[in-house]
Amino acid sequence: MEYDIAIIGGGPAGYTAAERASENGLKTILFEKNAIGGVCLNEGCIPTKTLLYSAKILDSIKSASKYGIVAMKDPSFDLAKIIDRKNKTVRKLTLGVKARLTGNGVTIVEGEARITGEEFGNIRIHCDGKEYLVKNVLVCTGSETGIPPIKGLSEVKYWTSREALDLNDLPKSLAIIGGGVIGMEFASFFNSMGVKVKVIEMLPEILGNMDKETSAMLRSEYKKKGVEFFLNTKV
């Protein structure tokens, strides 16, 4: 099977490039070893915002009396249903991206692609036992989660954002190393779910890329909710 262009990696860069290439008349094939949509859709922006919306509803019920609404003082929640809703949301959007790609004539291959050589001026790619010949290759493989070199970390069971998104049970307490956007999103969610949260940040303030006044205001609001902060702290 021959193609004008192969794109390795089905994240935002990869699937957008595949769509544009196909729209411009190129016979296009897209390889993805995990899930179409990349980190943002499957393990980042979308799932975290879905979880945070559930947390927002829970917080709203808890504070309903402020607005003259009589509600349960201690509303409960079903973690399994919260996670299931998150998974369904991600699945729906992933299927939407796939449908858009196939509708534009892009061939999608789910598996790990390997460039194995050249043949008559074409590049040879193997994936799941099949061979593909392409004229051009665009690599959009993204990145992996960076694990800091913390002494003893490899000896304990730690989470990255990936594990934190697929839970069966909530921990009683949680230390979050890093007070950036991702860290604070998880701090907000777990705090709303009743988990005792501590945020450890090596910089003088959380959300270091934001305006200092905004970061300080957000930290103050989180502290009111019970989140503990350790700034200027290295682990």
Task: Report residues per predicted region.
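Glycine-rich flavin
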Residues: M1-Y3, E19-L26, F31-L170, L203-L207, ...
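Conserved acidic residues
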Residues: E112-R114, G180, T233-K234
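Short beta-strands and strand-loop turn motifs
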Residues: A80, V199-L203, F230-N232
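Conserved N-terminal Rossmann-fold NAD(P)-binding element of oxidoreductases
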Residues: I8-G9, F31, V139, I177-G178
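Residue-level marker of alpha-helix boundaries and capping positions
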Residues: I8, N87-K88, I177, N209
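Conserved acetyl-CoA-binding loop of GNAT-fold acetyltransferases
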Residues: V195, K223, V227-E228
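N-terminal Rossmann-like FAD-binding beta1-loop-alpha1 element of flavoenzymes
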Residues: D4-L30, G183-N191
